[in-house]
Amino acid sequence: MGRVIRGQRKGAGSVFKAHVKHRKGAAKLRAVDFAERHGYIKGIVKDIIHDPGRGAPLAKVAFRDPYRFKKRTELFVAAEGIHTGQFVYCGKKAQLNIGNVLPVGTMPEGTIVCCVEEKPGDRGKLARASGNYATVISHNPETKKTRVKLPSGSKKVISSANRAIVGVVAGGGRIDKPILKAGRAYHKYKAKRNCWPRVRGVAMNPVEHPFGGGNHQHIGKPSTIRRDAPAGRKVGLIAARRTGRLRGTKTVQEKEN
């Protein structure tokens, strides 16, 4: 009998706790209020900061509270091209400039946006990773809905009252730079989660993994495995419908509708 394999140990583990010790806070849009719904409110970018475990930089934006004599600082996902000292305008009547926050229904078709709300008032859920953006495709004034194209390429119909930041998320091209050293990968995943290093099954001994052992590294058996296999054998391509490369498939032209 072999040892308890990695997949079994994982299933018996505790609930995941995010590594949030050095993080700067949750990046959100302003809570929607009367000033944003009917006009606009002005803020100033105080600082652009790095948040550990996140690819995109964050912008500290200071707003004067419209209801109390105090200032409020918000953490926005920084759009490409904003700078410290820049004025940021949030609201229905704000201008269409990089870094401003507007309802998607007021933006012309083809506008590039990021940190898009999925539901009105949820303060930004879509297109928030570094270099990502969504595109406003079309508006339906009768139903008050707007169609946007997400970074994955899928299209989503959302409410026209949903807000978004104009522009692309900063930090694009981050994954183009190779990691090169194990030390960099160590620090990267230390800030994110405990998932590194990951030893391959074929590099293990036979007691530690079904694919382990042998005079050279090879699986030595089919990598596909049935759905009802016991937990200690359930590794590889689980209940795969098909394997291998997609050969001879016809690329379908995407319809714009």
UniProtKB/Swiss-Prot annotation:
Query: What Gene Ontology cellular component terms go with this record?
Result: cytoplasm; large ribosomal subunit
InterPro entries, per this entry?
Answer: NA-bd_OB-fold, Rib_uL2_dom2, Ribosomal_uL2, Ribosomal_uL2_arc_euk, Ribosomal_uL2_C, Ribosomal_uL2_CS, Ribosomal_uL2_dom3, Ribosomal_uL2_RNA-bd_dom
Which cysteines form disulfides? none
Q: Which domain of life is it from?
A: Eukaryota
Where does the UniProt annotation locate this protein? Cytoplasm
Spell out the SMART domains in the cross-references: Ribosomal_L2, Ribosomal_L2_C
Its main localization is: cytoplasm
Q: Which UniProt keywords apply?
A: Cytoplasm, Ribonucleoprotein, Ribosomal protein, RNA-binding, rRNA-binding
Q: Which GO terms describe its biological process?
A: translation
User: Disordered: where is this region?
Assistant: 207-231
A GO molecular-function term, please? rRNA binding
Q: Say what the protein does.
A: Component of the large ribosomal subunit. The ribosome is a large ribonucleoprotein complex responsible for the synthesis of proteins in the cell.
Q: How does it assemble?
A: Component of the large ribosomal subunit.
Indicate the family of this protein: Belongs to the universal ribosomal protein uL2 family.
What protein name applies here?
A: Large ribosomal subunit protein uL2
Taxonomic lineage is: Eukaryota, Metazoa, Chordata, Craniata, Vertebrata
